[in-house]
């Protein structure tokens, strides 16, 4: 994006942020659709700006992720209002992420290589997170949602949408996100498989450069002894570490 246009976009965004931020603590049926749209556009704004060193969407190497706070704020807006009552036909394209029925994912079999990769991920979790491990519930839940997103995304790859992909990040637990932020290797591996789904959105210009940026950050945070588990996600994203 040309520098002049980028400066103008930032001015408009900062003005909108000043107007909308005070309302986020006072969500009502009359403003929730507008606030939901604002939060959605704000998340897209971060993507459009492009990746910054050390910022990995759901965790930053230099502090908390402001993008994640905004993205998860979408859930808070949904919970504060009954979207079924306030949603108008013209606002249907911004239906809440929680409305996407992952449980109704088609039963169509995945490509054998993808299925094998997901099974390898499940094995990694079983080996590294035992049944009495306090991390297990959040990890298994994240894996379950991820499988459903993969099924939807790979069933009609030409029609994969950001709603399908980011519904995973919308549904994972706060505990799982804390584990990612603590650079837990199992949580990082799950995140790397999510990055593969983001790769499928690269037809949208604002997603360009994000998959390789995220994968390189995950690789840097992964313990040396477990980096080989990232082989499949790295291959799918098209990123390899420098020699």
Please report, for each region that a protein language model flagged, where it lies by residue.
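Short, solvent-exposed coil/turn linker segments
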Residues: 52-55, 173
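A short secondary-structure junction signal
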Residues: 49-51, 85-90
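C-terminal effector modules of eukaryotic transcription factors
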Residues: 63-82, 89-243
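Amphipathic alpha-helical regulatory regions
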Residues: 1-6, 11-15, 29-51, 69-74, ...
